[in-house]
């Protein structure tokens, strides 16, 4: 009985956090430090929502899919224009310079692990309204297909079934020390080097991670030291 009460309390607390961070369109990972929409954060969040709020789960994923690029890329980050002090912001990524970038959303130019099909399946399996869930799957199917086609086409040029990452943030293990030696072996031109806005000063509540900026369309071989993760099954 005591264990069940503890579990119920944890569930209530988790729901309270999600409710507090819900914007009406997506869930902020952290209202102060991370106020925008992150790709796989939203997928995991939708998996949680689908167990008690089907509409919110589908809205979370729909908002992310609305920012999908024309070439199928599902961005790691969708910016909320109400929060302009976050770094690196849209002016760092210059995503709008790509003809494939979405027209109505500012995004980053990198991706995160593709768990979105799993999230969509969870939404269907736990749906209270099956008809609505099927409508959502019909909407999401083409989005997910384009997303995975992008990964196979752009990130597996040798057809090995191994999708490579272009940036540590794409792995989901952003701050892992496994990247330290790899990043030290990269040599960038001056126009590719990390830049920091002159007016940007980190506070105790806003600590910027080290950033490496690549060109808009870097060409790395699959033998690159960053070629890792996601083997096709």
What spans do the regions from the language model cover?
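Low-complexity, Ser/Thr/Pro/Gly-enriched N-terminal "stalk/linker" regions
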Residues: 1-37, 58-59, 63, 71-77, ...
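Solvent-exposed loop and edge beta-strand segments that line ligand/cofactor-binding
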Residues: 25-43, 47-51, 88-113, 230-233
């Amino acid at each position: 009985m005591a264990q069940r009460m503890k579990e119920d309390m944890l569930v209530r607390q988790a729901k309270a956090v999600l409710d507090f961070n819900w914007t009406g369109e997506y869930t902020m990972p952290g209202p102060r430090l991370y106020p925008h929409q992150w790709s796989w954060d939203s997928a995991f969040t939708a998996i949680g929502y689908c167990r008690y709020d089907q509409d919110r789960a589908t809205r979370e994923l729909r908002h992310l899919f609305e920012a999908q690029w024309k070439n199928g890329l599902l961005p790691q980050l969708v910016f909320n224009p109400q929060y302009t002090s976050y770094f690196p912001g849209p002016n760092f990524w210059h995503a709008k310079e790509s003809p494939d970038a979405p027209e109505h959303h500012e995004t980053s130019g990198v991706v995160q692990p593709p768990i979105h099909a799993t999230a969509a399946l969870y939404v269907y399996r736990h749906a209270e309204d099956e008809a609505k869930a099927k409508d959502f799957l019909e909407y999401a199917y083409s989005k997910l297909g384009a997303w995975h086609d992008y990964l196979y086409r752009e990130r597996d040029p040798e057809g090995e079934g191994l999708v490579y990452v272009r940036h540590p943030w794409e792995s989901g293990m952003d701050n892992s020390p496994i990247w330290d030696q790899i990043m030290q072996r990269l040599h960038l031109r001056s126009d590719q080097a990390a830049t920091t806005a002159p007016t940007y000063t980190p506070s105790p509540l806003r600590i910027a991670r080290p950033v490496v900026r690549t060109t808009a369309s870097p060409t790395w071989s699959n033998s690159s030291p960053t070629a890792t993760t996601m083997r096709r099954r």
